[in-house]
Regions:
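Polar, S/T/G-rich
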Residues: 2-8, 24-283, 292, 339, ...
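Acidic, small/polar-enriched beta strand-loop surface segments
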Residues: 100-106, 311-356, 411-429, 513, ...
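Short, well-ordered loop/turn sites that connect or cap secondary structure elements
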Residues: 102, 362-364, 462
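Extracellular/surface recognition and adhesion modules
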Residues: 217, 368-370, 382, 393
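Acidic glycine-/aspartate-rich tracts in secreted/extracellular proteins
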Residues: 303-304, 372-382
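Acidic, low-complexity/disordered segments
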Residues: 316, 464, 469-540
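Long hydrophobic segments that form regular secondary structure
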Residues: 345-355, 411-490
Length: 541
């Protein structure tokens, strides 16, 4: 199955490497040779709408199954509905939430109200934590490892029998007892926050729930039911373990504490293509999936100093240079949506990332556009460092580093106006992590220079994503760092076999992140509201 996928993706027969990059990753792949790849991997315009509908309960006869990695809020699909009891006062719902075993249920929501938050079970059932609802709602949880049908539904129903086990399906049985006051508005939308699929860690052969993107991608590659169906022998496990370590690196937070560099929290729709699903998953770690030497390699996003240098001894033809990206490929801001854990996993906008330099760090001789005169401290006198006035939007060439807390944008001055990339993050639920991914996308887009180098066969050792140093006297390159984004086979002008290496400039600085880079995110959180159904005795009378 994997071979067929590779053949379908690698449309050029000469290609020896396959990269499944993430949508935003290839937004920076410039040059005619990469334009086809860029178009193929750009994000779907309706991705944000799809994300927003994941907590909505559906009732479809042929609904696609879902795979949940990390933690997610999901509405599920009603696969069975029946009324029982006197006057049909009891309504039974079977809501399937995942097509596999999950680790745990953490909470249940009716519309926008949390009715259960992991409280005590009673005989395998949970009652609503909401005081007014508790007599009318009972929920039975099944994690997908069940070996028998739900006993309560089996006993109450004449149609649901002991044979209805729903193997390998995580589902809830929800029993609602009719009450005009509680359900006057009709059937509530039912959603649940769950810890999703347990995955294998190849470093110690343990299986447990994890938010590590590398381990979850490894699981999807090996999944014979819904994934790529690859064997372990065809996956370079050393790359899995290395990527796992990168994802687990601790990032310091401005508010104190740390967070893992990358996590994955979201839902894979099995109706989506394997290619698009892998792209979305690798996006959670700013990474890539490479097929090289007969094995898949998983790489998490990080800067690795080059250990290979290309010089005149390896070059067999003229280097093609593109010094600047088109306006369509370059942008100076990144914005988008994510499913915010701070807002109970509803669709939210993460703080937009734009080019910003704080006073004290301006580079003399460079042109900037004023963004703010003050940013939480003393104001900046931009007229003292080359500006004609202290006015937001004015361009100036810095004559000094500046003082105070004012900010200015290098990229806005270069482009003349704001150009945003709209980047949805379907597997990122933390606003700071979303900001880091967006900032990385922004800085990578500003790496303007792309080259195609015809090399001898020694270049066959390169893989997509490798950083290389290039030394060339004519172009003035002295170990200039580029990232390999593609290559093809061809012939040089004198008939030699050539490996045409396509690369784009890169730098370690684009991976830098400081707590001062964090923008304020105004999350809604949870609010306790009086529901009007319980009388509270007055006090202090």
């Amino acid at each position: 199955m994997a071979i067929a996928l590779i053949a379908g993706l690698a449309s050029m027969a000469s290609a020896l490497l396959l990269e499944l990059g993430v949508a935003w990753y290839v937004a920076f792949a410039v040059g005619a040779g990469l334009s086809m790849v860029s178009r193929a991997l750009m994000p779907s315009p309706d991705l944000g709408a799809q994300m927003g509908g994941r907590s909505v309960t559906t009732r479809e006869a042929a609904q696609s199954r879902k795979i949940v990695y990390g933690r997610a809020r999901i509405g599920g699909n009603i696969v069975y509905l029946e009324s029982t009891g006197t006057d049909n006062k009891h309504l039974w719902l079977v809501v399937a939430v995942a097509g596999h075993e999950i680790d745990a249920y953490e909470s249940v929501w009716f519309n926008d109200e949390k009715i259960w938050d992991g409280g005590v079970y009673q005989s395998g059932w949970a009652t609503a934590g909401n005081t007014s609802l508790s007599p009318y709602v009972y929920i039975g949880f099944h994690k997908g490892d069940q070996t028998a049908a739900d006993s309560a539904l089996d006993a109450a129903s004449t149609k649901w029998t002991s044979a209805h086990i729903l193997h390998d399906t995580a589902y809830m049985v929800v029993k609602l007892t009719y009450d005009r006051d509680q359900f006057g508005g009709g059937l509530p939308n039912i959603s649940t926050i769950i810890r999703g699929k347990k995955v294998l860690n190849p470093s110690d052969n343990s299986t447990a729930w994890s938010q590590n993107p590398s381990l979850c991608i490894y699981d999807y590659l090996r999944d014979t039911k819904y994934g790529l169906g690859e064997t372990t022998d065809n996956i370079l496990t050393a790359s899995v373990n290395t990527a796992k370590g990168v994802c687990d690196e601790a990032i310091t937070l401005a508010a104190g504490g740390t967070q893992p560099r990358y996590t994955i929290d979201g839902v894979i729709d099995t109706a989506g293509s394997l290619k698009s699903n892998i792209e979305l998953m690798t996006g959670a770690m700013a990474g890539r999936l490479v097929y090289s030497g007969g094995k898949f390699e998983i790489h998490a996003g990080e800067y690795i100093a080059p250990t290979i240098t290309i010089d005149e001894s390896q070059i067999v033809g003229e280097i093609t240079v593109q010094t600047k990206q088109s306006r369509r490929s370059a942008f100076n801001g990144v914005k988008g949506v994510f499913l915010s854990s701070e807002d109970n996993y509803i669709l939210s906008d993460y703080p937009a990332q734009i080019s910003k330099t704080v006073a004290g760090s301006f580079e003399v001789g460079k042109r900037y556009q004023i963004l703010t005169l003050v940013n939480g401290g003393s104001s900046t006198d931009f007229t003292a460092i080359g500006a004609s006035a202290n006015t937001v939007g004015i361009d100036f060439t810095a004559t000094g580093v500046g003082a105070g807390t004012g900010t200015a944008s290098l990229f806005l001055a270069q482009d003349g106006h704001q150009i945003f990339l709209d980047m949805a993050l379907p597997f990122t639920v933390d606003n700071i992590r979303a900001q880091r991914l967006a900032r990385l996308a922004l800085l990578r887009s500003r790496q303007q220079e792309a080259i195609t180098i015809p090399c001898n066969l020694s270049a066959l050792r390169f893989k997509i994503g490798d950083n290389i140093s290039v030394t060339n006297v004519r172009l003035g390159y002295d170990q200039k760092v580029f990232e390999v984004v593609g290559y093809s086979m061809g012939l040089s002008s004198d008939g030699q076999i050539a490996v045409n290496v396509e690369a784009i400039e890169t730098a370690s600085s684009i991976w830098d992140w400081s707590t001062t880079d964090e923008e304020v995110f105004l999350g809604g959180g949870e609010v306790d509201l009086y529901d009007g159904t319980v009388a509270v005795a007055p006090t202090s009378i």
